[in-house]
């Protein structure tokens, strides 16, 4: 059996779009596999993407949380993409803009058929805010698997880190096996192998594996 692991270091910028409608205009239809990354504006989403892909500037980090307003799409190969959704919930962003972003996020989760998994990034020191829970609930309602990624785990001692991880797992237990919880550090790479394993699994849904196998036989 050949190694089917995806090399996330091969991620390349594909497009930016202001909302789901424009995303549909730029992509070749709602096909293939997409894995989306969402989180509050100070959750370290861009840094996590850069660490996972081992690229310093794949996702641009900003000194001003909430600045990233676009949906940014990165191609892993011709069938698979990573989607960096706009950060949500930052206090200094105007209310009208917040509502626009939240509408776009909800629309994407509920309408994008090729969405194979959602990573919800949360600062481990401030997990499970209202909007985080809303994102998780939206995804679960749409039968989309979720990874609740507790970022900046290097900021806590090991005992405090594991307590928070266990507390979050208990809080999300009612969602069942569709929601996983893992600690992560963009600075030190803590948790990276486990996260990449989950993402790789999402990159290989049965229907895509079967379609690619059929294509090879033709």
From Swiss-Prot:
The name this protein goes by in its record: Probable GTP-binding protein EngB
Domain called EngB-type G: residue spans: 31-205
GO cellular component: cytosol
NCBIfam families reported for this sequence: GTPase_YsxC (TIGR03598)
Binding site for Mg(2+): 46, 68
Nucleotidyltransferase as UniProt keyword: no
Cofactor: Mg(2+)
InterPro entries recorded: G_ENGB_dom, GTP-bd, GTP-bd_ribosome_bio_YsxC, P-loop_NTPase
Entry keywords, A to Z: Cell cycle, Cell division, GTP-binding, Magnesium, Metal-binding, Nucleotide-binding, Septation
Gene (name only): engB
């Amino acid at each position: 059996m050949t190694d089917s692991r995806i090399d996330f270091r091969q991620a390349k910028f594909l497009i930016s779009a202001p909302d789901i409608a424009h995303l549909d205009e730029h992509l070749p239809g709602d096909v293939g596999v997409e894995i989306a990354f969402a989180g509050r504006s100070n959750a370290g989403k861009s840094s996590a993407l850069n660490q996972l892909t081992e690229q310093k500037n794949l996702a641009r980090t900003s000194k001003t949380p909430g600045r990233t307003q676009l949906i940014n799409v990165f191609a892993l190969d011709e069938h698979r993409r990573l989607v960096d959704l706009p950060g949500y919930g930052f206090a200094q962003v105007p209310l009208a803009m917040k509502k626009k972003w939240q509408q776009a996020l909800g629309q994407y989760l509920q309408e994008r058929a090729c969405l194979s998994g959602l990573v919800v990034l949360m600062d481990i020191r401030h997990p499970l805010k209202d909007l985080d829970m809303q994102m998780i609930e939206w995804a679960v309602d749409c039968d989309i698997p979720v990874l609740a990624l507790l970022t900046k785990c290097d900021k806590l001692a090991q005992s405090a880190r594991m307590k928070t991880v266990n507390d979050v797992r208990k809080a999300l237990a009612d969602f069942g096996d569709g929601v996983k919880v893992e600690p992560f550090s963009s600075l030190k790479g803590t948790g990276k192998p486990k996260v990449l394993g989950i993402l790789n699994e999402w990159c290989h849904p049965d229907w895509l594996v079967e379609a690619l196998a059929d294509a090879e036989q033709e």
